[in-house]
Amino acid sequence: MARSLLKIHRYFRRKPVRFFSFILLYLTAGSLVFLHSGFSSDSSTAGIAGSGSDPLLSEGRGGTGGGSATSEGLGLLGRVFKETRRTPRRFGPPWMKESRGQDAPEWAGRGFDHTSSWSHGAKGRTTKEMDDGRAKYIGCYVDDTQKRALRGVSFLDYKKMTVFRCQDNCAERGYLYAGLEFGAECYCGHKIQAPNVSESECNMECKGEKSNLCGGPNRLSIYRLELSQESARRYGSAIFKGCFRRPDNVTLALPASAVMQNMSVDKCVDMCTEKEFSLAALAGDKCHCGFPTPLFNLHEHEDEELCLHRCTGEDFESCGNRDFFVVYQTQVQDNRCMDRRFLPTRSKHLMALASFPGAGNTWARHLIELATGYYTGSYYFDGSLYNKGFKGERDHWRSGRTICIKTHESGKKEIETFDASILMIRNPYKALMAEFNRKYGGHIGFASQAHWRGKEWPEFVKNYAPWWASHTLDWLKYGKKVQVVHFEDLKRDLFSQLKGMVIFLGLEVSEDRLLCVEGQKDGNFKRSGLRKLEYDPYTVEMRATIDRLIKTVDMELRKRNLSGVPDEYRPR
């Protein structure tokens, strides 16, 4: 045996080329053996898929198909080869992954070739519902960088993009559609201007949410948004204000104007934005720009049908006419009410802005600061509010440098400290939910579903609902001079309610400043209108308790010759 090996060794030393040729032949033969085993196991997997079960989808659902069993005996090379030969994975939106029941389409569970079904007419058939009260999945669409499918605003986030974040941003701006692309890009628009394609082409995971898909390369996963009433009044970056009669003196009321060919909302809004005006008024083929003033205060709305005249540049838009203007608010900031400062001389009188938590105190402070030009203070200190512009937050509440002091206190001693107070009251059903969201999600955030369905919510209602009533009753009883302001009335008629608050604070009213506030009323202190609870969190017992408390407060208000609680939350 040793002699034979020695002879072979000497032979290959004399002829090394033959040695390397032999080694190469040996490796080739070994590779073919491995490849053959890969083909065999892959064909068995294909047989399983043909019987109505996609092994990849089965794994995703926790199924026990034969695909995994056949792969156990494969070496590394065999497994890699098998993966490369598989039918391309069919990615789909969440509704496809979840719905495999009776209502699922026939192709949802088998090896269906999506590319063979593309057509413009397929759009209606491929529309799948992800209907959670916020949005409905429409499909996968082509997107061209030169000619976008959705032509509104867009934003990118290559770390934290999610489906909800994109939907929320588009909804807040009043767009009807939200589309995601490349896993990280969000596009908004009022109409889809591209054909739909195979669902398999929208196959990229969201950067901030691996469980969802966010389009693909030059492919948009598009959702139709169910807008809140306020969001529905938006048009992209502009806010629809309504239909208004032509002002008596257009030149004074709206100082900039131009005749535009192929008029559209975008063209007029863009022109007024460029000229730095906060209002864009469309009058047929003419575009007017200006600010809200006593000459054109936007308080007397006309029937919107009077403005239903098609734009020459966009058939589905209304551009008004010579007598009735369609008005939009642009993104230009009206600076007439943005200057704020501390009181020039320290006040000896302490004015409270009192409310139950969740009754809109932060929002009311924002409005008061804009309307008066003076900072508001706080009985507490909240660093997050200071960082958002409430500079009076750091002052001691007795400093006398702020126009009023935020407080949620309700004890006799604390109330009698103040010389006068504005008492904010809000529907307890809304206030309790707002405070619960604040407690578990921040000033403009949301509590999670786990908090709502867990022990926290019932315990919260049990402790806080009686406080809602006792807080109001204590301020009515111990307050030296109290002006009641209902959150709902302030929201419904901001101009007159805020005017009354400014007068109560002992300041001169600036109508221009109040009109400016109307255009900036939300500030950064409003929760998104898109995320809604999908169920009523109040039990029958909770409602019975809260209704009794509402009646108690209503009776006390009427005893003092006040209007009582607003109709929307008085028990019926």
Swiss-Prot record:
<keyword id="KW-1133">Transmembrane helix</keyword>
<dbReference type="InterPro" id="IPR000863">
    <property type="entry name" value="Sulfotransferase_dom"/>
</dbReference>
<feature type="glycosylation site" description="N-linked (GlcNAc...) asparagine">
    <location>
        <position position="561"/>
    </location>
</feature>
<keyword id="KW-0812">Transmembrane</keyword>
<dbReference type="InterPro" id="IPR027417">
    <property type="entry name" value="P-loop_NTPase"/>
</dbReference>
<dbReference type="Pfam" id="PF00685">
    <property type="entry name" value="Sulfotransfer_1"/>
</dbReference>
<keyword id="KW-0677">Repeat</keyword>
<feature type="topological domain" description="Cytoplasmic">
    <location>
        <begin position="1"/>
        <end position="18"/>
    </location>
</feature>
<feature type="transmembrane region" description="Helical; Signal-anchor for type II membrane protein">
    <location>
        <begin position="19"/>
        <end position="39"/>
    </location>
</feature>
<dbReference type="GO" id="GO:0008146">
    <property type="term" value="F:sulfotransferase activity"/>
</dbReference>
<dbReference type="InterPro" id="IPR002889">
    <property type="entry name" value="WSC_carb-bd"/>
</dbReference>
<keyword id="KW-0735">Signal-anchor</keyword>
<feature type="domain" description="WSC 1">
    <location>
        <begin position="134"/>
        <end position="226"/>
    </location>
</feature>
<dbReference type="InterPro" id="IPR051589">
    <property type="entry name" value="Sialate-O-sulfotransferase"/>
</dbReference>
<dbReference type="GO" id="GO:0000139">
    <property type="term" value="C:Golgi membrane"/>
</dbReference>
<keyword id="KW-0333">Golgi apparatus</keyword>
<keyword id="KW-0325">Glycoprotein</keyword>
<protein>
    <recommendedName>
        <fullName>Sialate:O-sulfotransferase 2</fullName>
    </recommendedName>
</protein>
<comment type="function">
    <text>Sialate:O-sulfotransferase which catalyzes 8-O-sulfation at the Sia-glycan level using 3'-phosphoadenosine 5'-phosphosulfate (PAPS) as a donor, forming 8-O-sulfated Sia (Sia8S)-glycans.</text>
</comment>
<feature type="domain" description="WSC 2">
    <location>
        <begin position="237"/>
        <end position="331"/>
    </location>
</feature>
<comment type="similarity">
    <text>Belongs to the WSCD family.</text>
</comment>
<dbReference type="Pfam" id="PF01822">
    <property type="entry name" value="WSC"/>
</dbReference>
<feature type="glycosylation site" description="N-linked (GlcNAc...) asparagine">
    <location>
        <position position="262"/>
    </location>
</feature>
<feature type="glycosylation site" description="N-linked (GlcNAc...) asparagine">
    <location>
        <position position="196"/>
    </location>
</feature>
<feature type="glycosylation site" description="N-linked (GlcNAc...) asparagine">
    <location>
        <position position="249"/>
    </location>
</feature>
<keyword id="KW-0472">Membrane</keyword>
<feature type="topological domain" description="Extracellular">
    <location>
        <begin position="40"/>
        <end position="572"/>
    </location>
</feature>
